[in-house]
From Swiss-Prot:
<keyword id="KW-0547">Nucleotide-binding</keyword>
<comment type="function">
    <text>Not known, could be involved in the transport of ribonucleotides.</text>
</comment>
<dbReference type="InterPro" id="IPR017871">
    <property type="entry name" value="ABC_transporter-like_CS"/>
</dbReference>
<dbReference type="Pfam" id="PF00005">
    <property type="entry name" value="ABC_tran"/>
</dbReference>
<dbReference type="GO" id="GO:0016887">
    <property type="term" value="F:ATP hydrolysis activity"/>
</dbReference>
<dbReference type="InterPro" id="IPR003439">
    <property type="entry name" value="ABC_transporter-like_ATP-bd"/>
</dbReference>
<dbReference type="InterPro" id="IPR027417">
    <property type="entry name" value="P-loop_NTPase"/>
</dbReference>
<feature type="domain" description="ABC transporter">
    <location>
        <begin position="16"/>
        <end position="252"/>
    </location>
</feature>
<feature type="binding site">
    <location>
        <begin position="48"/>
        <end position="55"/>
    </location>
    <ligand>
        <name>ATP</name>
    </ligand>
</feature>
<comment type="similarity">
    <text>Belongs to the ABC transporter superfamily.</text>
</comment>
<keyword id="KW-0813">Transport</keyword>
<dbReference type="InterPro" id="IPR003593">
    <property type="entry name" value="AAA+_ATPase"/>
</dbReference>
<dbReference type="GO" id="GO:0005524">
    <property type="term" value="F:ATP binding"/>
</dbReference>
<keyword id="KW-0067">ATP-binding</keyword>
<protein>
    <recommendedName>
        <fullName>Probable ribonucleotide transport ATP-binding protein mkl</fullName>
    </recommendedName>
</protein>
C-alpha cells in the first residue's frame, strides 16, 4: 500500500479501465459490451432502473463475479485473467461499503472495523487499535466502539461499514446503495462524509444508487445502465445537461420517458404519455433543475478536493463537442463556481 504523502494525504486513487464487459446468468444477459474509464481520485456514480445489474457490476469490479467477456484493468492488472494470488493483492486496494453494511452481528463495532486489519495485515494489536479508533472517529462513531450492530440505528450501521471499508487505507472505495434505508437527513450527512473522505485521501470512489439528489449533487462523474447497455458515462456537467431521454427521465424522476414500471416502453405508450403531458396532466417526479445543480463541497477546514480541478479541465476540453444549450449551462456553472455543503441542499 502506498505511503501517505507530505501533506498528510494518501496519493491519488487508481483508475479503473473497463472494456467490452459482458455478464450473464445462464441464458439471461445482464449487460453487454460495457466500456468506461473511471477516473482516478474522483467520485463517480452509476445509475439505472432496478434490475439493470448495477450491483452485479460492482461485484465484478472486485472479482466476486466473473464476466464472460471483456477486461477490468486495475493498477495495470486485468482482474478477470489474473491469478488468485494477484486478485488477493489487488483487493487490498479496495474498501467496500455493502448495501446492508454487512456487519457481523456477533461482533461489536470495534471488532467489526478491526476485522480487515486482522485478516490482511500483521499489525500489532496496539497499531490496530489506533487505526480503528481513528476511522470510527472519522465517521462520527467515536465512543460507540463497544456497541453491537443490533443496538444502533441503520445510519450508524452504514457509518460503521464505511469505517471498516477505510481501515486498509483503500485507493478505491465502492459503495453499493449507501443511502438504502436512510432518511433524507442521514443521506445528506453520509453524502457530506463521502465528499470529505475523498478530500482527505483522494481515493477513487464509485457509488451505485437510485437516489436522484445524490446523483445531482455528489459525483464528479455519472454513468447510467439501461437496456443491458451503458447509455452514457462522463463528467457530471455533461449528463446533467444531456438531452438523452432515459437520462433526463431518471434524473427528474418522471413517468414520461423510455423507462416503464417493469420494462422499457413501446412507442405507442410513449406517444400516449406525451399527449397526456401536452394536455396538462402532471406526471409527478422530482423538481426539474435548470442548468447544472451545484456540487457539494467539503466541510470547512478540510483540504480542497483535487478531483474538481481535474474534472473541470476535462469538461472544458469537451465543450466544443457539446450542444450549444449544454455549453451555455456548463460555462455558467464553471464561471459561477457554484459551491455548497450537503446540509444546504436537501431532497
Amino acid at each position: 500500500m502506498a505511503a501517505i504523502g507530505g501533506d498528510g494525504r494518501m496519493p491519488m486513487g487508481v483508475a479503473i479501465e473497463v472494456k467490452g464487459l459482458t455478464k450473464s446468468f445462464g441464458s439471461s444477459r445482464i449487460w453487454e459490451d460495457v466500456t468506461l474509464d473511471i477516473p482516478a481520485g474522483e467520485v463517480s456514480v452509476l445509475l439505472g432502473p432496478s434490475g439493470t445489474g448495477k450491483s452485479v457490476f460492482l461485484k465484478s469490479l472486485i472479482g466476486l463475479l466473473r464476466p464472460e467477456r471483456g477486461s477490468i484493468l486495475i493498477d495495470g492488472t486485468d482482474i478477470i485473467e489474473c491469478s488468485a494470488k494477484e486478485l488477493y493483492e489487488i483487493r487490498t486496494l479496495f474498501g467496500v461499503l455493502f448495501q446492508d453494511g454487512a456487519l457481523f452481528g456477533s461482533m461489536n463495532l470495534y471488532d467489526n472495523t478491526a476485522f480487515p486489519l486482522r485478516e490482511h495485515t500483521k499489525k500489532k494489536e496496539s497499531e490496530i487499535r489506533d487505526i480503528v479508533m481513528e476511522k470510527l472517529q472519522l465517521v462520527g462513531l467515536g465512543g460507540d466502539e463497544k456497541k453491537f450492530p443490533g443496538e444502533i440505528s441503520g445510519g450508524m450501521r452504514k457509518r460503521a461499514g464505511l469505517a471498516r471499508a477505510l481501515v486498509l487505507d483503500p485507493q478505491i472505495i465502492l459503495c453499493d446503495e449507501p443511502d438504502s434505508g436512510l432518511d433524507p437527513v442521514r443521506t445528506a450527512y453520509l453524502s457530506q462524509l463521502i465528499m470529505d473522505i475523498n478530500a482527505q485521501i483522494d481515493a477513487t470512489i464509485l457509488i451505485v444508487t437510485h437516489n436522484v439528489n445524490i446523483a445531482r449533487t455528489v459525483p464528479d462523474n455519472m454513468g447510467m445502465l439501461f437496456r443491458k447497455h451503458l447509455v452514457m458515462f462522463g463528467p457530471r456537467e455533461v449528463l446533467l445537461t444531456s438531452d438523452e431521454p432515459v437520462v433526463r427521465q431518471f434524473l427528474n424522476g418522471r413517468r414520461i420517458g423510455p423507462i416503464g414500471m417493469s420494462e422499457e416502453k413501446d412507442e405507442s405508450t410513449m406517444a400516449e404519455e406525451a399527449a397526456l403531458l401536452e394536455a396538462g396532466h402532471y406526471a409527478g417526479g422530482a423538481e426539474e433543475v435548470e442548468g447544472v445543480p451545484p456540487q457539494i463541497t467539503v466541510t470547512p477546514g478540510m483540504p480542497k478536493r483535487k478531483a474538481v480541478a481535474r474534472r473541470q479541465a476535462r469538461v472544458r476540453a469537451m465543450l466544443p463537442t457539446l450542444p450549444k444549450g449544454a455549453q451555455a449551462a456548463i460555462l455558467d456553472d464553471l464561471e459561477g463556481a457554484h459551491n455548497y455543503q450537503a446540509h444546504e441542499f436537501g431532497d
